[in-house]
Amino acid sequence: MKLAGKVAIITGAGSGMGAEEARVFADEGARVVITDIVGDACRKVAAEIGANAIAIEHDVADEAGWTRVVETTLATFGKIDVLVNNAGLTKADTFDNTDVAFMRRMLDVNIIGSFLGMKAVRGPMKDNGGGAIINIASGLAFTSLPGYFAYGVSKWGVRGMTRLGAKELGPDNIRVVTLTPGAIETPALVPAVRENAAAMIPMGRVGGADEFARVVVFIASDDASYVSGAEFLIDGAMIC
């Protein structure tokens, strides 16, 4: 098992890609802390996994909430090896329709939330000899799609935070990597993307949540021990 003995925190893991990541991590031997702003959702996923998972209701933009997540993880499992900053807010809006309140919330969740997670786990990871932080971006962090102004801005920021974080946390043997999903089969997938996959995606189909989760497992594992500051597109060559 690729993650035997490791302890991972996965945010936004009450549904979709995050939930699948939690399941695959557990299958690979990890103990998993599942967080989500929807408490019932993360508790359901944790119950499915069993004794090797706990659930914490958590808004990633809340700094005090991060303290509670880290303290609970250490009290339950004794260490932190992996953080997957999977939680994110997605909403379409044009530049003209983006007000300050909407922009701030988008940045709070998609950038500040990941930043707070990185800050919160840095100490425990350093004390444990290192770790892996995986920030989930978006194809809109590599291209520009009108109508997703605030979301696109936030995901471009995630890429920069990963690169700078890798430089600054590298001396503590903490790796930081960006993973970028393309069209992945989840309840949140826009139906038109699924219907037009053959025309939009060179591989002719959308990706499975399990396919994306397997890449997350690889980056979290010791097989990727010299991978840091890198960016990976998991999108069937949709953007290249």
Go through each PLM region and give its residues.
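C-terminal substrate-recognition "lid" of short-chain dehydrogenase/reductases
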Residues: 2, 115-118, 208-234, 238-239
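Canonical Rossmann dinucleotide-binding motif of NAD(H)/NADP(H)-dependent dehydrogenases/reductases
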Residues: 3-32
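Short, small/polar-rich loop/turn modules that mediate ligand/substrate recognition or access, typified
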Residues: 84, 170-175, 227-229
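Substrate-binding pocket helix/loop in short-chain dehydrogenase/reductase
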Residues: 94-95, 99-107, 197
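Active-site helix of classical SDR
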Residues: 118, 154, 162
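Alpha-helical segment proximal to the catalytic Tyr-Lys
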Residues: 123, 167-168, 225
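Residue(s) in the substrate-gating loop at a strand-loop-helix junction
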Residues: 138
